[in-house]
């Protein structure tokens, strides 16, 4: 398959917080999209094998958990969010582990920080100010999150305002109805417009996989978003009844692999919604390692969208060091 790049010099060029090459986008190849098929039973068998085949223990588990922290988008997306809550979340991002845990780990050379802090547009400026000097990017959910149902002009303006306020990553929401009625051209055109509005900011496309009916729909939507220029594909808003799971993740990861084989462009993956336990995070990391390789276990190619995962990771680290589990209140988020 031969694909030509739409923009030889992609708008925005390199990210300000990652040397990773941006996805410039490619023409919509409907023949490729229509060839996509997914076998759900095979996906379920493969996903079911991950936990049993990839277990890490003792010091290795501690190392994997430290890596997991660097892959988290610390998130607060609640209707009752306040500037104070966002500031407290950013304070946690600056110091994600208690000092006594860091001292016991004895890894002073490691700078353990989360991948980003993710907030609503109204709090982008607050987060940018609170994170100044850390190198931690601010991600803003956008385009009428979580439903994605608003006039195109409104959604584009929301992106532009978040970028102007300092967001370096924009998590946009696709219109699920476009996937359900197979309107691939419409979906492609919207993502291209969103990509242009993002400028230098990386664009993550939220599929809302729990509302797309089939794994084949999820795979096709993933491909269309990547062809349109998405830097990341993301499972969910966290507001759906069904959020991230290993089966859907395997579908999306294999589309990322296929896309990389055909285009040479590496796309990031972000599972989100319901990932609150360290053991679950390790399964997703094992899946990424087995399907895409160690190179994808980096913040510019893999993130967890999570609001409480860090709390359990801290508990597991403390248990690994002391043999005792601490109460959640010893690892407060905000």
Q: Which residues make up each language-model segment?
A:
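Alpha/beta catalytic barrel-like cores
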Residues: 2-106, 110
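Alpha/beta enzyme core
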Residues: 59-69, 80-112, 121-270, 276-307, ...
